[in-house]
Amino acid sequence: MLNVLILGVGQCGNRILDAVNKEAMGGGGASKIAKYCLKPKFPSRVETVAINTAINDLKELRYTTAKDRLHVPNLHGMGANRNVGKQAFMDNRDSIMGEIEKRGDFDLAFVLTSTSGGTGSSFSPLLINELKRQYPNITVVTVAILPFREEGSIYLQNAAFSMRELMELDADGIILADNQYMKRFSGDIASAYDKINSTIAQRLLFLIESLDSEMLSVTDLGDFKTVMNGGLRIGTMGYYQADGKNSSVKDAIENSLKPNNLLYPANVADDAARAMVIIQGSRELLDVDQITKEV
């Protein structure tokens, strides 16, 4: 069984993590009190921790239990100041890593974070360094969220510095999601947030399940790491679910790469150095030879 750690850092990371827990509890059918009476059903052994300096951001989480929330004392957040955020992380490094360490060993960690805010963009590079130091054999992948352009110059500047630091790390790759790009398919900003968070959560859970399941062609953590280590070590995720109307394998693959099914604007066919194609369905409908040909 795969041992997975999912860390949501800062407000953006917290909300995506909460969406992950919601999906693991049953998606749209999960009620507001689900966290008190239900346990998320993950495909692997998954531990989740929401980390934030703003206690009010942690309080608003609806599907993440209190034991999975870590408040780093610093009044009410970083106010988009990355320098203050870095100092806050260093001041509280031992308690943060202690909270993670008591949850056991892990094969794979996802760090969910905005690149533009204060806590997420400043904590995440330092946190990833500590994870690689404390768990030498762990695979660490960042799910990095680029800001809406309307958020302003400070947030765009933070994103530039944060991305540079993330790319310089000795980690295993970055999965990019662009809020501005995905807003095109979600309407206005207010309604886009929930849609974007749930979209990322669904794809992340699908990926985890695929890395820890019996398949016609084995796809495991080593394969995922090889793909993420290709090129610039930056990737995105596409997803498509057939509606049951005689959708072919070719159609499924092509649809998963269409702009409205990607988290980031990319010409995958022309620009990708490596790719992993995961197809889930009934065995009688999956022909390995056909899949190999289409890929």
List where the protein language model places each region.
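Tubulin/FtsZ superfamily GTPase core signature
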Residues: 1-295
